[in-house]
Amino acid sequence: MAAARPTIAVADLGSGNLRSVAKAVEAAGGAAVVSSDPDLVARADKLVVPGQGAFGGCAAGLDRGGGELRQAVIAAIDGGRPYFGICIGLQLLFEGSDEDPSCPGLAIMPGRVRKFAPVPGLKIPHMGWNQTRRGPARTGLVPDGDEAGYFYFVHSYYPAPERAEDVALTSEHGEPFCAAVARDNVFACQFHPEKSQAAGLALLRRFVQS
């Protein structure tokens, strides 16, 4: 008899390619449920938080209905529920962002989200495939070895963790930047695994099966 697939809540913050993320989670072996219902988030085995667009818009999505979804996400993380953040779902883990300074993040990790500095000849947003390398944080979701693979990025802002030990992956766009973080039950990436073909699917599969 096949083992039951874990129920994975894909949090609907009102933006992001939710259908693509849900399909990728299903392909990785999870039972994806797209929802903004705090009760469903509280019951799910694991949590994926995607987001596209502006930091403030996604933060507002957490705060719809009196902030119950924000509290459900924080409670899930504090309770040890596996969390996988994608793009803005990574940035929301921090205290805030230079993009929308008045909007608070979840403050799970110390640090802020910064904008790439303008460099002659450098295109912003950073868009396309880029190589990643291992950072100090160790996680079973990322294979051993300095080079951790190529992933697809679309962003103008990047996380700047205060703790170097939270950095799981780095990449470079004019300057080195944090491409993923990991601590305990939390993993989040600035790139889009659902757009990153085999490398992205392998990463999601390790999350689903962990």
Language model feature labels by segment:
Residues A4-A9:
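Extreme N-terminal starter segment of soluble prokaryotic enzymes
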Residues A148, A182-F187:
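Beta-strand-turn-beta hairpins that frame and shape the catalytic cleft
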Residues E175-A182:
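Short, surface-exposed beta-strand/loop micro-motifs that present aromatic residues
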Residues C189-S210:
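Acyltransferase
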Residues V48-P50:
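Structural motif
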Residues E95-H173:
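Pocket-forming structural segment of enzyme catalytic cores
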